[in-house]
């Protein structure tokens, strides 16, 4: 178990930031002096002045060397954006980074290791917006992650290049780096927008030697070295990311957050506790899963900035690094072992053990061999002893039979002297037949010499055997080690031929040695493995011990039975021996007497009696012998069964050994076959390599020969007669190629003319758009004039209303003056006149209100039409942009066609000159297009100025709809023109395909004449290289133009944004002015209220005058006072309730009618009393009525003015909202246009790359064809 190595590297600071930095570094710890809790310790901390080599040598160098030995390794840089991660990993030409240093160090260690052969593969991928892209094969995008038992976690479809030098690796890396996503932010000009993983797969095995092919091991070590450059975490507030950059930053932060959670879980030991670690939440953590708590050596380089602005980001980076310190990995060597490799490895280990035994333990091995030989000898002796015992038993049985035969002969001799009956003879014959059996322990004495000696020998031997066996059999069975050292028992030292002597002279061997007996049939022990021999000895020893236990138990049982029988026979034998001795003495006496006197009848009787006794004894003896024979037979059968089992076991062992030998031989044969196959494959590869080298040398020779042939052809042009047909064919080919060239030139001229026509059409369309813009500007000016006219008319109307208001006020004053002079009879007429005047004023007010409403509606309509006109102008702009894009597409297609024509015309110098002319024309076209673009930009500025002018207008736009319809028709025409352009483009693409087919035909014809035009083909290759460089230059120029076009669009969008901001500011100012107007209107309302109060004071004064005038009639004065008081209250109420003007108007009219009715009543009452007084009071009454009417008109006017101002404010607010909506739409459209431009740029770049790849393939095909042609020559 080894933990992750974590080092910290600080980015260099400016002098100002270094003074204000809150972080302090001391040795391998970093802390904030003001915060005691913010202190971190790491394996290494590198200050601002350190070099990348120091960072590499801290831990990465060891990881690289371990990767060569078969350990997985991972190194990745972590930190916020603009902290120096890419500089640490990639470096620069002056100061190389970790990846170049690791690559060079890797190849250096491989070159130093001469005992192994290596195969290196590299891959380079990026994780962009959670999509895996192959940087070595840009067409491979959105790859998937898979997992299996053999490969583990891997990316399916990822391209892996076999590399053989560090220069090749770095070149491939540069190629992949050119396809990496890099963007610009406020914090970094070249900010990495994706995570990249540079992976080296290292395979190695031991070198195959000619002498020791069988000794080599096929175990393959496979290790993976990952060098990861992570994208930095960022904050949108600091980087200013928007749109695509914001999306990229969110994906980067999400993946880094998942990495942080995985590190946190592993540092807390969640995985060891059976918890869940979210490796699958991000593709980055899924790919790096083996490096995070798995089978790998891992190092983290944490890049930080000590500036005070980025204190929070530095703190989070250091917390991540401190958590990573607690994560442990378990790295081990990754080897792929086959069965053959395992067998070879075991053989190698066995051979190493043997060599060790021979070298270091030679004495000990000799002793072990001697012990093994002794055990084998002992086992063979034991075996021979068993065989001798069997043979001796056979000899003993044969000897017993021989003794019985001799006894039978003696009995026959005796029976010849005595006449016996047939019954006795039969008995004797039966006795002789039965007496042939083995006589083991008890043999009767039939004669003095032979039988007594035999019996004494047998008894002495039996007693010695019994004594020896009793000592060994009374106790338990002894182990083999004691049996070997058991004392010997000499049963009969004098008898050298006896069986027991041979048995006792043999030493009991070690039973484990029975299997390993060195006999002629068995192979020598030196040819076997000592480990295998020991295992077989242990197994056979166990089997032999089991068989020996079984044999001993059976033998003990049989011997116990024999002992019992011997006891019985001993008891019977004493009496039988005595009787035998007596019978023998008597027989001898009788024999001697029989010689003397043969005719003595008493002697005959005695002989008969003795004969009967002998027969009885013989019967008993035969029965006992039968029992003994049965027991012996059972014991022998058991011994035979045991021996058969032992033989079967030995046969099984022998068969198992043979099977093992056969299996070993098969394994050896298979190993040899596998080795032969591998050797054949390797030899085939070597042969292929040598053949390739030979072919290359032959190709060079053919090149040299072609050059010599060309020189010879140049010299042989003098022999025109011999080479005339070749020259004729060559001239025909040149003519055909010139004709094809002319056709190509014509097609190019047609394409060029079509492009010129398209350019002219675009210029015409541009002129039309300019005319439309001029017309729109004139319309806008007319609308401005009309708006000014409407404003003047509105001013006139307002002045007219004010004059009418003043007239009405004067009229009311006149009426108030006339009230005092009116009589009671004329009050009714005046009342009617007042009503009529009031109604007229009402109608006039209604007319003015309707006019104002109509004007406001017209204004809203004009603003809506204005907004629609602006939208249509935007559409025109977008269509113009689309036309410009089409022009750029046509330019790109023209460039592609130029490239194809360049490839086709590279064979002849004349075509090159024409192509240069075409390039000049194309350059002129590009200049014209650039001028057109500048003009379009100028027109855009003019249009933007016109839009700014239009934003401030609030006048009517009546005729704009018709003109917009006309512009729509024109737009439809433009769309039709665009479709025509598309069809032309399709036709041009078909022409291009035809050109490509023609090129293919030309190539085929060139292949046929390659034998005769080798020099020209070589020149063509050189020219192709030149034109490929030109193509690259053209593509770079196109890319620069596209970038410039993008920058121009961005500048225009920024201008539009600034203008829209200005419009917003103007709208805000208008809102402020409207608020000021509202305040002014409120102040006017207050002033009106104050004037109404003044008028109420005047009414009070007039009431006092009426009181003085009505002194004559108290009733009339009281009525007038009450009426005046009511009018005062009503006026004050009307001033307070200014918001509810209509209700107050109704209330005032009703009150006025009541007053008029009261005035009529008063006039009737006063007509009878005093007309003169009424006439005097008429003037103040009229003044009052006039003042009331004037107040009513003022109230109506104030209400109308307030309503108008409210309506104006509402309309202005609506206009502002519409403008804001239009601005937001413009912003969205600009964003969409920028995204479309980016997509199209990506598609165009992808197409260019595909075409470049196809051209490269064509070049390779041409080279192959050249090589094939050279081989055929």
Curated annotation (Swiss-Prot):
GO biological processes: microtubule-based movement
- Residue limits of the Kinesin motor domain? 3-327
Top-level division of the source organism's lineage: Eukaryota
The residue stretches assigned to a coiled coil in this entry are 333-408, 602-674, 751-1023
Instruction: Enumerate the UniProt keywords alphabetically.
Output: ATP-binding, Coiled coil, Microtubule, Motor protein, Nucleotide-binding
Q: Name one GO cellular component term.
A: microtubule
Q: Where is this region: Disordered?
A: 452-474
| Any Pfam family the entry gives | Kinesin
Binding-site residues for ATP, renumbered to this chain: 79-86
Name the SMART domains on file: KISc
**MF (Gene Ontology):** ATP binding; microtubule binding; microtubule motor activity
Where in the sequence does UniProt note compositional bias of the Polar residues kind? 453-467
Q: Sorted alphabetically, which InterPro entries does this protein's record hold?
A: Kinesin-like_fam, Kinesin_motor_CS, Kinesin_motor_dom, Kinesin_motor_dom_sf, P-loop_NTPase
Tell me the PANTHER family matching this sequence: CENTROMERE PROTEIN E (PTHR47968), CENTROMERE-ASSOCIATED PROTEIN E (PTHR47968:SF75)
Regarding protein family, the annotation reads: Belongs to the TRAFAC class myosin-kinesin ATPase superfamily. Kinesin family. KIN-7 subfamily.
Name of this protein: Kinesin-like protein KIN-7O
Gene name for this UniProt entry: KIN7O
